[in-house]
C-alpha cells in the first residue's frame, strides 16, 4: 500500500511498489507496447481493490484515455457472469483487475467458459502459483505485475533449492512467491540486526537498515538499497509477469517485460 512509504515515516520500510503504482506501470506498458485501446476494470470493493482501480484510472487519464467500463464486487462473491458480460459488451481489450487469488481464478474460469479471449492484468496480490497452476489452463492470457520472478524448486541455484526443500519439509507444500518474499524480507531484517549488534536501540536499527546498499536476495530480486531519505527497498523498475503453459507441465510464470513506475519519479523525501 502507498501508506507504507508515502509520506515518509522514519520507522516504516516498504519492500515493494504499491498496488497503485504497479497498476499504473502495467496499464502504461500494455497501452504503449501491446497497443491496447479499451481499458476496463474489475476490482474488489475494498481498500485494496480501490487502490488498484485508482492506479488504472490515473494512468489512463495521464494518457488522455478513460476507463471504458468497470465492475466491482465483494471479496465473497462467486458469480461473475453478469460483470464479464457487461465488460464484453463494452468491447474491452484490457481488463485491469484489483483481485487476489480466489476471485482471480473464478473470473478467469468464467471468461473461459464464455469463450472470451481478452487480456487481464493483475498486480502483486494475484501473482501466485494458485493462479498460474489453476486447473483448466484458465491462466492463459493473464498477466501480473511483480517486482521479480518467482524462483521454482527446480531452479539451478543451490541456495534456492535448499530453501525450497526446507520450506516444503516444514509446511508440506512448495513455496509460492509470497513465501519467497517473506523469507527475503526476514533476511534483510536479520542483516540489519547483525549490523546493529547486541546493544540494540531504535536508532541503531534504523541506521543499520538505512545503511543497506545493493543487497541481493537468493531469488534474484532487484538489489535493495536504502538511505536516511529513502526507505523503499526495491528499485521502482517492475517486471511484468506473463504466463505460459509448457506442454505436459503445469503453468509457470514467465517474464514478459519491464515497466517503469508511472507515478513515482523518485524516493519520498524526509520532511525537514
Language-model segment annotations:
Residues 1-70, 119-144:
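Extracytoplasmic ligand/sensor domains, especially the bilobed periplasmic-binding protein
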Residues 1-5, 73-80, 100-105:
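Beta-alpha junction/loop-to-helix N-cap segments that form part of ligand/metal-binding clefts
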Residues 9, 108-183, 194-196, 200, ...:
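Extracellular/periplasmic periplasmic-binding protein-like sensory domains
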Residues 15-38, 79-81, 104, 130, ...:
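Hydrophobic alpha-helical segments within soluble ligand-binding/sensing domains
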Residues 28-36, 57-65, 85-92, 109-116, ...:
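Sec-exported extracytoplasmic/periplasmic mature domains
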Residues 40-43, 91-101, 107, 118-123, ...:
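Periplasmic-binding protein-like
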Residues 169-179, 190-249:
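Segments of small-molecule ligand-sensing domains
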Residues 232, 236-268, 272:
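Acidic, proline/serine/threonine- and glycine-rich low-complexity intrinsically disordered segments
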